[in-house]
């Protein structure tokens, strides 16, 4: 199985590293526009093999998409962060151009690949990749919910003082600090609702911490996080390549699900060899429905900036 990761920065390289040492794919290609950068990252990862015991072939390439041919999954991490003085529309315009070009190039060489979008604003870039390429909706997946849910489980773990892997919890909605919806009502520890252990006040703080989880790390690190994002992408890729059919919150195209249409937004999905195998219909209460509708409106508003690109 072959995975291409476009963008050899911190998130892309971490994703390649995790995929390699976990043996998720037999081959990983890192591609970047910066001369020699992906090659260096790939060589560094390969030199871990004797210490970590993996056999994955990792290679790097500078902007040569022919080397990505035959990829089962392509991960797009390319894009720029928002800079001081830059409007939301300007950021979307620049990153949309990058994502569109990358998606078109990889599809020339891997027409049946499944594309995982990581670039921000993630829901809008996922929608752009879908609309610009015409790829079937099950093969375009935005990663955001996997990361947001991981952060939610981590904060619940800290509040409960219990292992995160014993906690089930999910975040739906847009991948943004005002649009995501941590489903505290449905979170559980070894099958027992966390509401049995944590007060409403604590749960509200956990939800709030989750929503600003990315911003918190940016404040501490001085740049965006990369370990958890890279691992979240690898987790998603693993479910695709090995047909694990895990339930993962992902940004996908909805057509009536949860009362929404013509947007990509985070919803619970079954992820397998065909990409999005199924969108699960979780019964939301009235408050959660209202929050989801508000989140969808915000995502739709972001998508408006794509109109000039998608004509």
Curated annotation (Swiss-Prot):
EC number(s) on file: 1.1.1.37
Record carries keyword NAD: yes
Molecular-function GO terms, alphabetical: L-lactate dehydrogenase activity; L-malate dehydrogenase (NAD+) activity
Temperature profile: Optimum temperature is 40 degrees Celsius.
Domain of life: Bacteria
Known partners and oligomeric status: Homotetramer.
Function: Catalyzes the reversible oxidation of malate to oxaloacetate. Can use both NAD and NADP for malate oxidation, but NADPH cannot be used for oxaloacetate reduction.
NCBIfam families in the record: MalateDH_bact, PRK06223.1
Protein name: Malate dehydrogenase
């Amino acid at each position: 199985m072959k995975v291409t990761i476009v963008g050899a920065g911190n998130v892309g390289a971490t994703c390649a590293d995790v995929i390699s040492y976990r043996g998720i794919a037999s081959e990983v290609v890192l591609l970047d526009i910066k001369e020699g950068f992906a090659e260096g990252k790939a060589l560094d990862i390969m030199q871990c093999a004797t210490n970590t015991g993996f056999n994955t072939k990792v290679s790097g390439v500078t902007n040569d998409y022919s080397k990505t041919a035959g990829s089962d999954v392509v991960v797009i991490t390319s894009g720029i962060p928002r800079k001081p003085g830059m409007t939301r529309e300007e950021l979307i315009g620049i990153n949309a151009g990058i994502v569109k070009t990358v998606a078109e190039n990889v599809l020339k060489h891997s027409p049946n690949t499944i594309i995982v979008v990581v670039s921000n604003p993630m829901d809008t870039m996922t929608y752009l990749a879908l609309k610009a390429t015409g790829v079937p909706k099950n093969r375009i997946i935005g990663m955001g919910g996997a990361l947001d849910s991981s952060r939610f489980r981590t904060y619940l773990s800290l509040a409960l003082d219990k292992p995160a892997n014993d906690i089930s919890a999910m975040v739906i909605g847009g991948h943004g600090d005002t649009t995501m919806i941590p489903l505290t009502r449905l979170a559980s520890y070894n099958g027992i609702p966390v509401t049995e252990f944590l007060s409403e006040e604590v749960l509200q703080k956990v939800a709030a911490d989750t929503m600003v989880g990315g911003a918190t790390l940016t404040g501490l690190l001085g740049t965006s996080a990369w370990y958890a994002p890279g691992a979240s992408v690898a987790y998603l890729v693993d479910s695709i390549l090995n047909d694990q059919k895990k339930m993962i919150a992902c940004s996908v195209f909805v057509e009536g699900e949860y009362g929404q249409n013509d947007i990509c937004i985070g919803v619970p999905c079954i992820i397998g060899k065909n990409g999005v195998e199924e969108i699960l219909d979780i019964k939301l209460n009235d408050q959660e429905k209202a929050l989801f509708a508000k989140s969808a409106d915000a995502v739709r508003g972001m998508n408006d900036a794509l109109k000039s690109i998608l004509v």
